[in-house]
């Protein structure tokens, strides 16, 4: 059986989740249908969002129309926290990957709640982990080839959104090859080639419900072998 001890970031996320559930218990949830936007780049940003159920992807689009997927967030996550920066409008577009239920919290109220529950210091540390993750993604774009970036991306998604099975991690959210290409920084055809290679090497598979199964130890060992 694969076991994993909760990290400080995981523990803080649980504390923040409880705090925000208390803060929003009397407010109605916002229902966002699959493929619909929560907000788009350029919108005013005065609120943070807390995900009750579902998945949200954050995407930035270049002037040439090329998409870069920044992150995928699931139940218990917050997003839209750049409203705390005092910058102009939203820099990214937030889109539901499946039917999603959200709670909306004004930025000032969000900070007040964290302060009330003595979670501000933890929130700063939580954000630094996100920054470190993004720095690693940027470094990988320069130092790691596309196949390795895909493997690392699959492992990151599995860690964040997957469900543990005895010898693998199951990803139930549907992520298209086009979306993976936007995360990895390559083309959809190349993603298809690499995914087929991973399947042939028994590093990943799809179950009868079409969920992606990541064989964590095998994939990690393979990535180490091709450095």
Identify the role of each PLM range.
Residues 159-227:
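Phosphate-/nucleic-acid-contacting segments
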Residues 38-43:
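Short phosphate-coordinating micro-motif centered on Lys-Gly-acidic
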């Amino acid at each position: 059986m694969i076991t994993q001890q909760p990290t400080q970031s995981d523990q803080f996320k649980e504390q923040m989740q409880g705090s925000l559930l208390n803060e929003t218990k009397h407010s109605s949830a916002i229902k966002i249908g699959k493929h619909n936007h929560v907000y788009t780049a350029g919108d005013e940003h005065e609120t943070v969002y807390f995900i009750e159920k579902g998945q949200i992807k954050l995407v930035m689009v270049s002037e040439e129309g090329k998409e870069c997927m920044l992150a995928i967030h699931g139940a218990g996550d917050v997003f839209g926290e750049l409203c705390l920066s005092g910058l102009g409008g939203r820099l990214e577009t937030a889109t539901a990957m499946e039917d999603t239920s959200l709670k909306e919290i004004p930025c000032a109220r969000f900070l007040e709640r964290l302060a009330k529950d003595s979670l501000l210091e933890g929130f700063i540390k939580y954000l630094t982990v996100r920054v470190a993750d993004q720095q690693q993604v940027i470094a990988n774009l320069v130092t790691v080839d596309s196949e390795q970036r895909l493997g690392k991306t699959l492992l990151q998604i599995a860690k964040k959104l997957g469900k543990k099975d005895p010898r693998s991690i199951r990803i139930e959210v549907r992520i298209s090859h086009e979306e993976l290409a936007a995360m990895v920084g390559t083309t959809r055809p190349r993603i298809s080639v690499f995914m087929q290679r991973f399947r042939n090497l028994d590093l990943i598979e799809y179950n009868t419900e079409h969920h992606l199964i990541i064989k964590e130890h095998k994939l990690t060992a393979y990535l180490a072998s091709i450095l």
